[in-house]
Amino acid sequence: MEPELFQQEPTSKTQVIASSGPFQIEFIEYAGSDDYQTLIQISESLVEEYGPAAKLTPNTIQTYFNRDGCLPFIARHQGDIIGYMIGVPLDMLDKEPWARLDINFGKHNTIYTYAFVVQKQYKGNGYAKMLKRVYLN
């Protein structure tokens, strides 16, 4: 695990955006260290398709969940985090060569979807579709 170079609060701060029965979508204002292991575990399913860089670490959680301008959303089922979707303004990715080549780079009008994942056992229930719908709105 990489060294942690930041102060961490244990409790996440979220705002419920949508809910239906046992399912809800929350905007993360701050991802607390109590949720890191769950987020990292969920991200492991991305490694198969996208490689080891897709797995979250405490540092990438700080970068993409707790950075001003990013748009991190989580999905919960019966209170447990089951997935997440993270949007990053394209202009914040100025160190990425491919981002600088995008026709919208510098216009401050584009959100890049950094990650979108829902745990396998919750697929087929419409939860991923609802998370995406909230994210796009």
Regions found by a protein language model. Give the residues of each.
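A short, structured loop/turn motif at beta-sheet edges
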Residues: 80, 121-122
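GNAT-family acyltransferases
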Residues: 41, 52, 63, 89, ...
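Conserved acetyl-CoA-binding loop-helix of GNAT-fold acetyltransferases
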Residues: 114-118, 124-137
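Conserved acyl-donor/pantetheine-binding loop and adjacent beta-alpha core of acyl/acetyltransferases
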Residues: 81-115
